[in-house]
Curated annotation (Swiss-Prot):
Cofactor: [4Fe-4S] cluster
Protein name (database record): Lipoyl synthase 2, chloroplastic
Something else known: This protein may be expected to contain an N-terminal transit peptide but none has been predicted.
Catalytic activity reported: [[Fe-S] cluster scaffold protein carrying a second [4Fe-4S](2+) cluster] + N(6)-octanoyl-L-lysyl-[protein] + 2 oxidized [2Fe-2S]-[ferredoxin] + 2 S-adenosyl-L-methionine + 4 H(+) = [[Fe-S] cluster scaffold protein] + N(6)-[(R)-dihydrolipoyl]-L-lysyl-[protein] + 4 Fe(3+) + 2 hydrogen sulfide + 2 5'-deoxyadenosine + 2 L-methionine + 2 reduced [2Fe-2S]-[ferredoxin]
Annotated [4Fe-4S] cluster 2 binding sites: C121, C125, C128
All copies of domain Radical SAM core, residue ranges: 104-325
Lineage: Eukaryota, Viridiplantae, Streptophyta, Embryophyta, Tracheophyta
Gene, per the UniProt record: LIP1P-2
Single Gene Ontology MF annotation: metal ion binding
Organism: Zea mays (Maize)
Pathway info: Protein modification; protein lipoylation via endogenous pathway; protein N(6)-(lipoyl)lysine from octanoyl-[acyl-carrier-protein]: step 2/2
GO biological process: lipoate biosynthetic process
EC number, as in UniProt: 2.8.1.8
Cofactor note: Binds 2 [4Fe-4S] clusters per subunit. One cluster is coordinated with 3 cysteines and an exchangeable S-adenosyl-L-methionine.
């Protein structure tokens, strides 16, 4: 496993390229931090690498603002869990304020990612800050209704639901997830619901049940490239299993939109990232997000590289070129990064009525 982390990225020389697009692509690749032997030898997998310094572009102001404060108070009073808090998301201020910044100057629609099935995961992925246990508390049977009541009271048009892994439950928590979606749709039929799910241990029936619960976007993350799966994720997760989840979800409904996410900076090569993108496109995944892996603590995986904003822009353009309908790519981008903004502006307000309509066209043009 050590060797898979140490492989340098494969980059062709600029002198061998032809055309403006090729030159621009080469410059973006060259902007990425240099991969050094000393960096590769740090580890084996955890602790801080003294040679890898956090760059200025990752510095964020402390979250504040009226919208942020109001949403945080509401979530606390209702005893809801959010992945924004539990996973230490760096975008909490920006998303909860409705985009634009952590200080409350956003003018969009606030997006919070509600975490159902409790705050304790049965798996121990080496990148994740969420607490773990083999025997977490049983799910709260009132959580689906309480979550729906809370979200409906916020007046939002888009919500992201996610969950911890619950391998202790027969269906992995799929039915609980589905009940939450149905409760939301009953209280507010026009709301758009994205579900960022676990793999349900590859249980196709559980995937189908949730996919047909009324959700609008089925999201499941492959997290990293194939070669790093066993280093980064819990052994019960897997690259092919995650692809199978997304493929089955896509086939469950004609109008299903699917989404996945990849972390960068864990030791992946450019060719591996490209292959992961192609694997996702081969099963019809519509949306891809790419962001920088940030180490929650010294117990977690070491950051191998801080990818530059220019390189993230390269990956955005590359992803669009291979057919993703939308790509969000940036150092602080996460799975649910401003998800509501992307969809509300182009699905709800444009009154999408046909599954063939592209809700991302205007966003893609503007970027």
């Amino acid at each position: 496993m050590q060797s898979s982390l140490a492989r340098p990225p494969v980059l062709a020389g600029c002198g061998e390229r032809r055309g403006l697009a090729a030159v621009a692509r080469c410059r973006a690749e060259a902007a990425a931090p240099v991969w050094t032997a000393s960096r590769a030898s740090a580890g084996p997998y955890t602790g801080r690498d003294p040679e890898v310094k956090k760059p200025a572009w990752l510095r964020q102001r402390a979250a504040q603002g009226e919208k942020y404060a109001r949403l945080r108070e509401s979530i606390g009073e209702l005893k809801l869990n959010t992945v924004c808090v539990e996973a230490q998301c760096p975008n909490i201020g920006e998303c909860w304020n409705g985009g634009g910044g952590a200080g409350g100057e956003g003018d969009g629609i606030a997006t919070a990612t509600i975490m159902v099935l409790g705050d304790t995961c049965t798996r121990g992925c080496r990148f994740c800050a969420v607490k773990t246990s083999n025997k977490p508390p049983p799910p709260d049977p009132l959580e689906p209704l309480n979550t729906a009541l809370a979200v409906a009271s916020w007046g939002v048009d888009y919500v992201v639901l996610t969950s911890v892994d619950r391998d202790d439950l027969p269906d992995g928590g799929s039915s609980h997830f589905a009940q939450t979606v149905k409760a939301l749709k009953e209280l507010k039929p026009g709301i758009l619901v994205e579900c960022l799910t676990s793999d349900f241990r590859g249980d196709l029936e559980a995937i189908s049940s949730l996919a047909n619960s009324g959700l609008d976007v089925y999201a499941h993350n492959i997290e990293t490239v194939r070669s790093l799966q066993r280093v980064v994720r819990d052994p019960r997760a897997g690259y092919d299993q995650s692809l199978a989840v997304l493929k089955h979800a896509k086939g469950s409904r004609e109008d299903m939109i699917t989404k996945s996410s990849i972390m960068l900076g864990l030791g992946e090569t450019d060719e591996e990232v490209k292959q992961a993108m192609m694997d996702l496109r081969a099963i019809g995944v519509d949306i891809l997000t790419l962001g920088q892996y940030l180490q929650p603590s010294e117990r977690h995986l070491t950051v191998r590289e801080y990818v530059t904003p220019q390189k993230f822009q390269f990956w955005k353009e590359y992803g669009e070129s291979v057919g993703f309908r939308y790509v969000a790519s940036g150092p602080l981008v996460r799975s649910s990064y401003r998800a509501g903004e992307l969809f509300i502006q182009n699905l709800v307000r444009n009154n999408k009525t046909e599954s063939s309509m592209d809700p991302y066209a205007e966003i893609t043009k503007s970027n």
